[in-house]
């Protein structure tokens, strides 16, 4: 039915739309806040603003029939201006769930408020234990590693980086480890992002994609070594705002609280960063081997998702345990071994310093940096290893002075000259063949 002046909406005079009045009425009908140009409802961030454009189109299509695309774009921009809000608080005392708000003291309310992240799972304290999920994990991981996974997945429910860890799940392939990512997607919804850890480090726009995200999953980790690790290390331990860039937008400062969960066939390594800080931020769990002749269940994920309310309670249990332990994860002996193996395989200087027949640690001895490096290159040659730089070897020793009971000095006497080296270590002369 054609509209007449008597049926025109208040914001339309027959020729023009009163944008202020339209936006006020639209926001009364669809409450929203605009933070840094992005719209939020009580259900969290609106990822697809096309939904809002469609609602605007429905409102105006009764009175206008041409130029709709441009008008919708202009009205959306006006709505954002009128809905302006400073950044929403990062709340670590509660979890916004599909049916209300769960508080970390164990209380729950059905009330909803504006938030950065609203999970897509409901809080149901009477949900049955997730038997299929627990069976799946028992077939995937060693029993002592399951509490670590439970704590990490619980850690991903809160917008905090106090745990200062990323989790790597390593296997030979085909074990089903990536099912965990799909289950987390069902709990977190749009608060989870799937991308590559390599992209996070190398693409300057990728960090902005992690804003307002609780979890980033890399379900097929690239095995090539990272050329840099600055951003990854900063994000894992993020405690203050960092620079964000979006295409066509002036860079700005924002705080990230995203956690990294990576699945792959090998560990995350760096091309140049062999520091303890890089490895200290990682938890490495290895999966059980895939049983020979096992028939994979194509409906496994569907079965797991039917238990998502119970899985959420299981994750909450891990979160409460983690907080009770002051954000210190339960790390099994096997997981610690995994980390040491990764460190040694990516930094052969560690193996050299623990070897015999090339160097000897003695309190009353000394060796020049050159002599130590020559011993190291002999070790590399004997073990078919590619040698690192002389600076890298000296740096490794200097960073671990207390561990090896050595002391860096520039007062080692060699052939009447004073050179750089270390006290407390000597190079062993090679035996003649």
Which residues are covered by each model-predicted region?
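Replication-associated primase and helicase/ATPase modules
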Residues: 1-30, 40, 45-46, 125-139, ...
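Structural recognition of the conserved hydrophobic beta-strand(s) that form the central parallel beta-sheet
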Residues: 216-218, 258-265
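P-loop NTPase catalytic core of nucleic-acid-dependent motor ATPases
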Residues: 27-51, 95-214, 283-285, 312-315, ...
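Intein modules and their embedded homing endonuclease domains
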Residues: 1-119, 388
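Phosphate-handling catalytic cores of nucleic-acid transaction enzymes
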Residues: 305-348
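Conserved nucleotide-sensing/catalytic segment adjacent to the nucleotide-binding pocket
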Residues: 206-249
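A short, contiguous, amphipathic alpha-helix enriched in charged residues
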Residues: 12-21, 185-190, 225-242, 394-395
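Positively charged interface segments
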Residues: 188-190, 195-204, 226-229, 243-251, ...
């Amino acid at each position: 039915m054609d509209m007449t002046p008597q049926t025109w909406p208040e914001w339309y005079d027959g020729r023009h739309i009163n944008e202020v009045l339209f936006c006020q009425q639209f926001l009364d009908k669809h409450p929203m806040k605009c933070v840094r140009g992005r719209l939020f409802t009580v259900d969290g961030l609106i990822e697809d603003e096309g939904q809002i454009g469609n609602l605007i189109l429905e409102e105006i299509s009764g009175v206008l029939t041409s130029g709709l695309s441009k008008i919708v774009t202009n009205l959306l921009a006006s709505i954002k201006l009128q809905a302006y809000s400073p950044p929403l608080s990062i709340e670590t005392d509660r979890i916004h769930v599909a049916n209300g708000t769960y508080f970390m003291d164990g209380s729950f309310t059905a009330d909803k408020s504006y938030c950065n992240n609203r999970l897509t799972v409901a809080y149901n304290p009477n949900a049955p234990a997730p038997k299929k999920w627990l069976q799946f994990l028992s077939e995937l991981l060693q029993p002592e590693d399951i509490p670590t996974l439970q704590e990490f997945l619980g850690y991903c429910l809160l917008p905090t980086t106090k745990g200062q860890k990323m989790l790597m799940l390593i296997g030979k392939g085909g074990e089903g480890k990536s099912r965990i990512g799909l289950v987390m997607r069902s709990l977190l919804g749009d608060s989870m992002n799937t991308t590559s850890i390599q992209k996070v480090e190398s693409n300057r726009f990728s960090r902005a994609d992690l804003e307002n995200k609780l979890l980033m999953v890399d379900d097929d980790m690239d095995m090539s070594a990272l050329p840099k690790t600055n951003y990854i290390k900063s994000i894992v331990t993020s405690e203050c705002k960092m620079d964000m860039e979006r295409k066509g937008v002036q860079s700005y400062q924002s705080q990230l609280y995203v956690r990294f969960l990576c699945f792959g066939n090998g560990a995350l390594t760096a091309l140049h960063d062999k520091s303890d800080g890089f490895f200290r931020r990682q938890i490495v769990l290895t999966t059980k081997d895939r049983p020979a002749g096992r028939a994979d269940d194509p409906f496994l994920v569907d079965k797991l998702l039917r238990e998502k309310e119970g899985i959420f309670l299981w994750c909450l249990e891990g979160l409460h345990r983690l907080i009770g332990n002051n954000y210190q994860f339960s790390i099994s002996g096997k997981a610690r071994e995994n980390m040491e193996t990764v460190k040694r395989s990516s930094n052969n200087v560690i193996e050299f310093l623990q070897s015999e027949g090339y160097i000897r640690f003695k309190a009353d001895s000394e060796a020049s940096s050159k002599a130590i490096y020559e011993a190291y290159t002999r070790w590399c040659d004997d073990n078919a290893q590619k040698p690192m730089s002389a600076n890298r070897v000296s740096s490794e020793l200097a960073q671990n002075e207390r561990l090896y009971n050595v002391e860096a000095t520039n007062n080692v006497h060699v052939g009447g000259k004073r050179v750089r080296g270390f006290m407390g270590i000597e190079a062993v002369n090679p035996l003649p063949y």
